[in-house]
Amino acid sequence: MNRLLQRQLFLENLLVGTNSMFHQISKHSINTCCRSLQRILDHLILLQTIHSPVFRLDRMQLRQMQMLACLWIHQHNHDLQATLGAIKWISP
């Protein structure tokens, strides 16, 4: 398997895993969602330092994952203040 295909599979698996995790969380557990998101982001940052460049995500991809998570939080939480607080909490 060539390096480009390896990277594509890695990114797809990462996005699928993130997406399925967020869909399993109920709209009432916003704090759980934020903690899980923070763990994912911490893990991604760790991957930036220990894996070869083929597996590294660029800053734009990390930001896109944050935005997807923020959109999920917004869609599943009807308390605007809690949503804004969560978005501030996970944003760099």
From Swiss-Prot:
Belongs to the rotavirus A NSP6 family. Keywords: Host cytoplasm, Host mitochondrion. GO terms for cellular component: host cell mitochondrion. This is Non-structural protein 6. Interacts with NSP2 and NSP5. It is found in: Host cytoplasm; Host mitochondrion. Pfam families: Rota_NS6 (PF04866).
